[in-house]
Amino acid sequence: MFYGGWKEIEIQRGLEQISGQFSLQVTDRWAGQADSRPIRPGQACVLTIDREPVLTGWVDETQPGYDANSTWFNVSGRDRTGDLIDCSAIFKSGQWKGASLKRIAMDLVSPYKIAVVVGPLAEKRAHAAIASFNIEDGESVFDCLERGARMQGVMIWTDGRGQLVIDMPGTKKAATALVQGENILRLDGKFSWQERFSEYIVKGQARGKPHGKGSAVDAVVSRYRPLIILAEDQAHGPSAARRAEWERTVRIGRGNRATVRVQSWRQAGDSGPLWAPGLRVMLDSPRLRISAEMLIVSVTYLKNAQDGTVCDLEIADPRAFDLLSGVRSAGLKSSRNGDKGLDSGRKEKKHRKKKGEEDFSEL
């Protein structure tokens, strides 16, 4: 059944969230609809934009209400994978020996009738055998899968069709650049060291063997800020080092962000494809002192009386994610000589990186 009567819409999708989510405000009835409020919690739903699915899942809540001047009916829900966030991880004995991340994921999500898709950049890691993996008591399915993804250095998200995706961001480019003074309605930047550390030290314990240990350095963090992480598995040297690199990489990517608002859910005005997570997009913003290719991490489609039809794009330095996938990007450039953009070109002598290694944003 198709539903109409939409008044306000917010749909969010992202590479760093296992489930998309939506919030809608609708009228009690609309043309051709005789029943009042036919949408109910627990119903299956597919949200499409011009027949293109952007979310496939379930209605979580309905919130009817009224006051002296108006009535309203709010509906919210998530992708099918939202159940993986809420529900406990259960599978036979709760232990796997020599299973791949894909096998573990399939075993955990099969009761929810969710398909597991492995992208091309994660093929090797998603199919590599994990010596031993256990469900921890009280752990949700998402927590269990996210722990496995950290161990293998990959990411998990959903694709708008209700499937669980194991992959890394690719290199597909957006058809439209983001240019200050042209199509950028608003831009909010965030450059933070709060969750970044100078060194990440991962420790593991293999039975009958000494502690496995690995480390990774964030060359931009110039003061002493160490972080010790206990490995999720019985880590040995190489896996502990990979886990440390994963932690550093993800924290760098999350520490440097900007949210760009554009007019329309589609690129090139209303004529191009939908804005989508995972696209590479050129950003030219003298105000932020950036002229570079960025990665769209999440997309929020909005429609309301105040803002009209707009799209919020959360973007990040793609090199942080490239370290995970093995892809190399060009360095970010400051749009003004002598100014400090995302990549200032300045390196602390104390943490000078070796030739061939990347430096990251500094503000």
What label would you give each PLM region?
Residues Q21-Q25, A44-V46, N74-S76, I201, ...:
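Beta-strand secondary-structure signal
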Residues M1-I90, M151-G153, A174, V179-L187:
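Assembly/oligomerization scaffold segments
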Residues G20, Q43, P53-L55, T71-F73, ...:
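Envelope-exposed proteins and targeting segments
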Residues R29-P64, Q95-P111, D270-E293, V297:
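Short, acidic/charged, Gly/Pro-enriched secondary-structure junctions
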